[in-house]
């Protein structure tokens, strides 16, 4: 064999192990990167907040009330947003008393005041305050988080 043939063969023999080492290093790096990526989502998944609980609504039948003003009538439908299901059950159990409290509250209203946005917001606050008191001594207060008008006619 000539010297040039030996040099070519030795150059090839150097390149083959070198390419094998580079390929193994690339595979090892890719495997490590993949493993690290799989470990990260578990820490991020724990950081997501839980979805908010479903709202609890309590729809009341509509009320028709004579106002203190002469010949004025209020027709109002109300739905209450409550804190929890226990409050809903308690209000349903004492529904006649709840309706009585609201009828008395509505009959004390002034038509001129109810015709404005501020008057309607004031009525919402009054409904929350009226229903917050315990229905029976020894029971907890009712937590009404919001009052929604479903019908509102002022004649």
UniProtKB/Swiss-Prot annotation:
Membrane topology summary: Single-pass membrane protein
Transmembrane portions of the chain: 13-35
Keywords, ordered alphabetically: Cell inner membrane, Cell membrane, Chemotaxis, Flagellar rotation, Membrane, Transmembrane, Transmembrane helix
Protein's UniProt keywords contain Transmembrane helix: yes
Location of this chain's protein in the cell: Cell inner membrane
Single biological process term from Gene Ontology: bacterial-type flagellum-dependent swarming motility
InterPro entries recorded: FliL
A single Gene Ontology CC term: plasma membrane
Summary of the function given for this chain in its UniProt record: Controls the rotational direction of flagella during chemotaxis.
Family: Belongs to the FliL family.
The protein, known as: Flagellar protein FliL
Species this protein is from: Salmonella typhimurium (strain LT2 / SGSC1412 / ATCC 700720)
Source taxonomy: Bacteria, Pseudomonadati, Pseudomonadota, Gammaproteobacteria, Enterobacterales
Gene coding for it: fliL
